[in-house]
Amino acid sequence: MTQTIFMVGARGAGKTTIGKALAQALGYRFVDTDLFMQQTSQMTVAEVVESEGWDGFRLRESMALQAVTAPKTVIATGGGAVLSSENRAFMRDHGRVIYLRASAAVLAKRLAEDPEEAQRPSLTGKPIVEEMLDVLASREALYQDVAHHVLDGTQTPSLVVEQILQMLTGEMVK
């Protein structure tokens, strides 16, 4: 198997943590689209949103997704990458999509503990638990629609990676 693996889910779901571990287990390259955008634009996510608005950020996100897609690559997508129907079609057509699902309470707790959180702009201006409830309510169907596999992102990263490896091995046998 050499296809691209896309990790989708809300902020704090574990896409980067699990994506890195999965890439290491597979001998793949790992790319985080938010980090890629920051490196190529020389701006933080907050700075891109401030200067170009959310539409500009989403456009950059789509371009980054296409730019980093390559065989033997695990990609941690931005939480909102699924908002674009073009992004959803692109990911489904170019690899396997894994949705890391977690409750709003778990996501809020992880984000509150994340030192990078300060550079991520609020999507709604609400407290983080309320924001995550809103985000999940508006995106859950999109995450489900794009995903080839849905996994419980609240488990330990090693367990999630093990489950992904088993799923991918099972697909190769079919």
Swiss-Prot record:
Report the record's Gene Ontology biological process terms. Answer: amino acid biosynthetic process; aromatic amino acid family biosynthetic process; chorismate biosynthetic process
Which parts of this chain are annotated as the region LID domain?
112-126
Residues that bind Mg(2+), according to the entry? 16, 32
Positions of ATP binding: 12-17, 120, 155
| Pfam families in alphabetical order | SKI
Tell me its cofactors: Mg(2+)
Supply the EC number(s).
2.7.1.71
Q: In which pathway does it act?
A: Metabolic intermediate biosynthesis; chorismate biosynthesis; chorismate from D-erythrose 4-phosphate and phosphoenolpyruvate: step 5/7
Q: How does it assemble?
A: Monomer.
Member of which family?
Answer: Belongs to the shikimate kinase family. AroL subfamily.
The identity of this protein, by name, is Shikimate kinase 2
